[in-house]
Amino acid sequence: MKDLIIIGAGQAGLAMGYYLKQEGYNFLLLEAGNRIGDSWRNRYDSLRLFTPREYSNLPGMIVKGEGNGFPCKDEMATYLEEYARHFTLSVQLQTEVFKIKKEKDIFELHTPTEILQAKKVVIATGGFQQPYIPSFSQHLSSHVFQIHSSQYKSPSQIPEGKVLVVGGGNSGMQIAVELAKTHGVTMSISHPLTFLPLRLFRKSIFSWLEKLGLLYAELNTKRGKWFQKRKDPMFGFEGKELIRSGAIKLEGKVVHASENSIMFQNGGTYSAESIIWSTGFIQNYKWIEIEKAVNEKGFPNHVKGISPVRGLYYIGLPWQSQRGSALICGVGKDAAYLLSEIKKIDQ
């Protein structure tokens, strides 16, 4: 039996592992993927982070390369793999936990091949789990090509002609920008877009956000509450310029679909040929069969990652304790805090 098991060996799980390693804990990381970093490795081919390398680090190890440059997805996948190797973090791959229970003071983690036991558990599966596509998409004709943004790889994957990108987040914008070179692109958005430069006065925008106290704004502060009410901005002006030139057309929120017709909230319609649903992800915590671990809405029940269930913790959730909780640059702060809380119950 382990002192502690971390479910998920992505950026959040590895950051937690780093701090536990420093304190000599007997712990194990469980990773469902074939390799550490697959969540990055399997993203679309052209993906680059909008956080520069100097803001793309986990505790104790920097990303190789020029600090102001923007790492690609494969760099990040390699970095995470090398991070686990460098700190000799114990990771068990190809191990999906499909159920977790607590019997007396011991957690039981059910996998397809075994039941693992631990005194404490950190759930680091993150806030982005199952791709979400609106149910009305099922009413579209089979002739309409449809994929979720998590399945998108490159423009060659999309049939010739026009394409509708549904969703106004940074992933949707990056995909729309790439497709605008080869396809007629329309974006469906549900709110006005705000654009921020990647650099301002030769400094990364993230440097300015940090100086303004916004990058790591804490959950219940005035800055944090203000930030939570705002939609995430688009980073970079390439999309803005393509919208201005007409290379990317904008439409409102999609509310219904039938055959090859898409209906927007303003009453307009669109004849669909190909659709990329950049509509985000939903969290699924039904596999946690522990009373009080999950609230009535199905979300983790916690305060700054600490569950009311003794010995159970969460890490990597959006706004877990601060703005950077789900970002690679900020997850280490939460990991350090959780370590201090874990040590308290061991005293």
Language model: regions and residue ranges:
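Flavin (primarily FAD) cofactor-binding/catalytic cores of flavoenzymes
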Residues: 1-33, 38-39, 68-170, 174-347
